[in-house]
């Protein structure tokens, strides 16, 4: 569970920004996006393979330049 200490002397905006940053670090937003719908394991592997190929192409381009 994510918790943020709110200091009454500081503005609310700063506490909200700290909360958003903590959520980003914890990966809550990404996890919610991933859990919106079920993805079969075979589909996960296909996506992972596609991403690996894409990363390899990008790294080849960078190495060539």
From Swiss-Prot:
Transmembrane segments: none annotated. Pfam families: Ribosomal_S21. Signal peptide: none annotated. InterPro entries: Ribosomal_bS21, Ribosomal_bS21_sf. One of its GO terms (cellular component) is ribonucleoprotein complex. Keywords: Ribonucleoprotein, Ribosomal protein. Gene3D superfamilies: Ribosomal protein S8. GO terms for molecular function: structural constituent of ribosome. The keyword Kinase does not apply. Disulfide bonds: none annotated. HAMAP family: Ribosomal_bS21. This is Small ribosomal subunit protein bS21A. It comes from Francisella tularensis subsp. tularensis (strain SCHU S4 / Schu 4).
